[in-house]
C-alpha cells in the first residue's frame, strides 16, 4: 500500500519508541454514501478525549490488512463490510505510549449486520457510532479538539476524509 504521509507527535514529549503497531482502518459507507465514525469521549492517560475517529484496530499475527479491517468493523461497530478500495498508509507516532503507528486505510461498504463484541476499553471510550454525510463528517473533524490525541487523529484523518469526498464525487460522475 502506498505511503501517503508521515506525521510527528507534537502533543506529548518524545522519549523513545519501543514498538510498531500495524492498524487497519476504514471509511465505511452505507447505501447513502454516508461515512461511519466513532465518537470518542473519555479521560485517561492521554488526557481529555473528545473527537471523532474512523473505526479499525490492530492487525493480528497471520492476518491480512483486509481481514483485520473486516474483523475490527464487525467487533467494534457490528457491521459486515466489503472492501471496495485502498486509500493508503499514514504513519504517525504516539510518544506517550512509545509507539509508531502504521495506519492502513480502506474504503468499504456495509453489506450486513454482524456481532458487535467490543473490548471493555472500547465500551468505555466509544460513546457513539453513527453515519454522517461526507460534508458533515469533514465539518466534525474541522471542529474537533485541537490538542492532545484529538489533534493527532485530526491531522491524520481530515486529509483522508477530503480524499474520500473526492472519491465519492468521481464515483457519482460515472
PLM features: residue spans?
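Conserved Nudix-box catalytic region and its N-terminal flanking loop in Nudix hydrolases
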Residues: 34-75
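Active-site-adjacent beta-strand/loop module that shapes the phosphate/pyrophosphate-binding cleft
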Residues: 92-116, 130
Amino acid at each position: 500500500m502506498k505511503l501517503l504521509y508521515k506525521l510527528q507527535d507534537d502533543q506529548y514529549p518524545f522519549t523513545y519508541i519501543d514498538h510498531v503497531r500495524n492498524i487497519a482502518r476504514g471509511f465505511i459507507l452505507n447505501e447513502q454514501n454516508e461515512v461511519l465514525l466513532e465518537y470518542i469521549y473519555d479521560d485517561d492517560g492521554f488526557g481529555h478525549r473528545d473527537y471523532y475517529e474512523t473505526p479499525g484496530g490492530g492487525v493480528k499475527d497471520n492476518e491480512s490488512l483486509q481481514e483485520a479491517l473486516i474483523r475490527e468493523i464487525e467487533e467494534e461497530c457490528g457491521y459486515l463490510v466489503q472492501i471496495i478500495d485502498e486509500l493508503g498508509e499514514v504513519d504517525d507516532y504516539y510518544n506517550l505510549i512509545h509507539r509508531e503507528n502504521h495506519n492502513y486505510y480502506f474504503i468499504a461498504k456495509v453489506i450486513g449486520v454482524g456481532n458487535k463484541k467490543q473490548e471493555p476499553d472500547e465500551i468505555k471510550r466509544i460513546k457513539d457510532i453513527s453515519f454522517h454525510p461526507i460534508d458533515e463528517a469533514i465539518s466534525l473533524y474541522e471542529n474537533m479538539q485541537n490538542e492532545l490525541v484529538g489533534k493527532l487523529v485530526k491531522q491524520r484523518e481530515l486529509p483522508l476524509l477530503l480524499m474520500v469526498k473526492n472519491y465519492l464525487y468521481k464515483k457519482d460522475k460515472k
